[in-house]
From Swiss-Prot:
EC number of the protein: 6.3.2.1
Organism of this sequence: Myxococcus xanthus (strain DK1622)
SUPFAM superfamilies: Nucleotidylyl transferase (SSF52374)
Record-listed ATP binding positions: 32-39, 150-153, 179, 187-190
Reaction(s) catalysed (UniProt annotation): (R)-pantoate + beta-alanine + ATP = (R)-pantothenate + AMP + diphosphate + H(+)
Protein name listed in UniProt: Pantothenate synthetase
Domain of life: Bacteria
Organism classification: Bacteria, Pseudomonadati, Myxococcota, Myxococcia, Myxococcales
Binding site for beta-alanine: 63
Signal peptide: none
Amino acid sequence: MAPAVLKTVADVKDWTAGLRREGHRLALVPTMGFLHEGHLSLIREGRRRADVVAVSIFVNPTQFGPKEDLSRYPRDFEGDVAKCISAGAQAIFAPAGPEVMYPQGYQTYVEVTDVSQGLCGARRPGHFRGVATVVTKLLTLFRPEVALFGEKDYQQLQVIRALNQDLHLGADIVGMPTVREPDGLAMSSRNAYLSPEERQRALALSRGLKAAQALLREGTRESEPLVAAVRRELEAAGLREDYVELVDAERLTPLASVAPGQPARLLVAAFSGTTRLIDNMQLGGEENAGRV
């Protein structure tokens, strides 16, 4: 059965009101479209956790900087609908235009402070304000019991967890493991920008993280050699580093080392050609160095 396609705020309110009357549990998967297997894994997990899954497809203009790729961000709505059907989504919210979410005179924005300050937040001013605003609007509009996000955008996930808690939005925020291509490249809609050569060089991000993981398993816990392992792979592949940082997994504050049992995260951002890519992995904590 084809999913309901919701175009306006009124459409969403009418549709969710029907769910509430019938007592259904709702899972929401917010996306910017051009869906890949990572997104579909969120939809399938949503089916396991709720009765009904809604997917939002909205290229959110407020999270793009003036020199970023808003106009060329990849789009394929018909393909996205087919993928949503295959994964079991029952509704798609695809605003008819940006004015649905940001009508004329719009002036309210949400800003999460601490966890948005470093990493991507320091290099993309205003990005997380845009993310926090649109996700707050979606959670308020849909009022889902569950909302699912990928761990590939790890800082974004922590921003969303913070706003959900601080604003008492009541959703269960679920972070799902990064889905990777067979050669280790983290799936991303922006991978479509990469030439074959750039894509091959982009494998340095996951190779570097695996090298750091191996060092940790051998007993190296200091930040400097773990970060250096990633940087060596980036340099060898000719990638331009944006950042490589070891941080506390919850607060995202820099760490000098990984203490036994302490959840930490190693995050990397780099350019392959003109395309900025990000990746990360867990170090320490219950999973004992995580998985790449």
